[in-house]
């Protein structure tokens, strides 16, 4: 690297910002330009469905860095600017205002966008009381409409849908949550964990309806507001506010148009490079081969974005990056903290540590004798211990995992001893 090297980062979310500041912290001396179409100061997204929506956080408290930190680190922040094309031959990105920025290294941190509800096109999608939750503007609009005794219909039983439902219940709204799946959190948790969260929400007052498909909407006479949600089973649900959260689509169009390999994300190698070695990708938009799980994955999480950003900074500055860590996720609903580590896909059994009747347990997902993932509810110590089990692939004794008379740290110590003697 030298003082004339140019790094352009496309995307001003967490991944992009962390790459920029990580480069400076690692000794990068060249130019850094951070480009994104958002017009607000880069900010954290997870609190939008939690503290911010509940009115317990301000926009300023969500900033990833203070506004003056960018100039202080000689990072040029180009907000409100869209990158429309990549010219790989000239090593330039083309901006919406016609400018071209030269790069020696290009980092795509383009993130993702909410998966659209197929039946919510036209006037429905433009209605002020029909929203997805991805941006600060979305959260502000929703927060203004969290009015006591009003009727909220949430479409989608994933993390966002459940977190929004919990916040709305606390605002004394009447909440109905619809999910096409047979249970909430079906894609990411085992049936007992889904049952725990369904019970938790129903006890709080949420009307959860699984196996329910939305087929349309009723609109006000002026076509400005949604007045009811229509379901395939004939149910009509009057609504003052509708929020849809049915997944994320990675923003790969820029990469695809530039001829980069795309497959449910921008495909990258172990060095974070795309099919063009001068272009890297990071965060929600990046698909990579996990060494831990020996399969291709795309992970939507804050910890993954942070880890990959640090890896890019280390690689570009000629340093040795850390080994892959187990991915982890979290969700706060009511006063319950759910923390999950690992990827449970492919598990063939679960072991419960604690009682599912109380908000104080861990669920281990196993494939054979290997622990693939762990869900912990209000057990932060076991969560941290579980990260070690999965990252280090420790051969813990499965029969002991459900026995609370044996501390998890002792199970881990025995597994380490077995590894060292092998």
Swiss-Prot record:
Q: Which GO terms describe its cellular component?
A: cytoplasm
Offer an example of a GO molecular function term for this protein.
Answer: oxidoreductase activity, acting on NAD(P)H
**Residues annotated to bind FAD:** 15, 37, 50, 83, 134, 284, 302
Enzyme Commission designation: 1.18.1.5
Alphabetically ordered keywords of this record: FAD, Flavoprotein, NAD, Oxidoreductase
User: So which cofactors does this thing need?
Assistant: FAD
Q: Name one GO biological process term.
A: (+)-camphor catabolic process
Q: What drives induction of this protein's expression?
A: Induced by camphor and repressed by CamR.
Give the record's pathway.
Answer: Terpene metabolism; (R)-camphor degradation
Keyword Aminoacyl-tRNA synthetase in annotation: no
Pfam families attached here? Pyr_redox_2, Reductase_C
Which reactions is this enzyme annotated as catalysing? 2 reduced [2Fe-2S]-[putidaredoxin] + NAD(+) + H(+) = 2 oxidized [2Fe-2S]-[putidaredoxin] + NADH
Describe the function of this protein. Answer: The oxidation of camphor by cytochrome P450-CAM CamC requires the participation of the flavoprotein, putidaredoxin reductase CamA, and the iron-sulfur protein, putidaredoxin CamB, to mediate the transfer of electrons from NADH to P450 for oxygen activation.
**What protein family does this chain belong to?**
Belongs to the FAD-dependent oxidoreductase family.
Q: Could you describe the subunit structure of this protein?
A: Homodimer or monomer.
**What is the name listed in the Swiss-Prot or TrEMBL entry for this protein?**
Putidaredoxin reductase CamA
Species source reads Pseudomonas putida
**Quick one: which gene encodes this?**
camA
């Amino acid at each position: 690297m030298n003082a004339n090297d140019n790094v352009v980062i496309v995307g001003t979310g967490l991944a992009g910002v962390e790459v920029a500041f990580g480069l400076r912290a690692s000794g990068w001396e060249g130019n850094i330009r951070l480009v994104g179409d958002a017009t607000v100061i880069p900010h954290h997204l997870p609190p939008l469905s939690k503290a911010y929506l509940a009115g317990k956080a301000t926009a300023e408290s969500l900033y990833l860095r203070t506004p003056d930190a960018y100039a202080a680190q000689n990072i040029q922040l180009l907000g409100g600017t869209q990158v429309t094309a990549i010219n790989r031959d000239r090593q330039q990105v083309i901006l919406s205002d016609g400018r071209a920025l030269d790069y020696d290294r290009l980092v795509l941190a383009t993130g993702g966008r909410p998966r659209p509800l197929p039946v919510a096109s036209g006037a429905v999608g433009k209605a002020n009381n029909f929203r997805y939750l991805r941006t600060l503007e979305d959260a502000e609009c929703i927060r203004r409409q969290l009015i006591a005794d009003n009727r909220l219909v949430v479409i989608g039983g994933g993390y966002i849908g459940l977190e929004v439902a919990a916040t709305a219940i606390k605002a004394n709204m009447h909440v109905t949550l619809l999910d096409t799946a047979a249970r909430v959190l079906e894609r990411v948790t085992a049936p007992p964990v889904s049952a725990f969260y369904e019970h938790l929400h129903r006890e709080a007052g949420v009307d959860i309806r699984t196996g329910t498909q939305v087929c349309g909407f009723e609109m006000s006479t002026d076509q400005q507001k949604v007045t009811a949600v229509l379901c395939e089973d004939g149910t009509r649900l009057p609504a003052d506010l509708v929020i849809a959260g049915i997944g994320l689509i990675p923003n790969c169009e820029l990469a695809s148009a530039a001829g980069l390999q795309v497959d449910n994300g921008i495909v990258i190698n172990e060095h974070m490079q795309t099919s063009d070695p001068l272009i890297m990708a990071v965060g929600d938009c990046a698909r990579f081969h996990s060494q831990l799980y020996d399969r291709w994955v795309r992970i939507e999480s804050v910890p993954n974005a942070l880890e990959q950003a640090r890896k890019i900074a280390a690689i570009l500055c000629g340093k040795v990056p850390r080994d892959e860590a187990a991915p982890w996720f979290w969700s706060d609903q009511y006063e319950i903290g759910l923390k999950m580590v690992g990827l449970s896909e492919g598990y063939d059994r679960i072991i419960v540590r604690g009682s599912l009747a109380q908000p104080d347990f861990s669920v281990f997902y196993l494939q054979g004798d290997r622990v693939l993932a762990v869900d912990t509810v209000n057990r932060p110590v076991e969560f941290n211990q579980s990260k070690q089990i999965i990252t280090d692939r420790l051969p813990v004794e499965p029969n002991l995992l459900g026995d609370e008379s044996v501390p998890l740290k002792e199970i881990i110590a025995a597994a380490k001893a077995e590894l060292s003697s092998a």
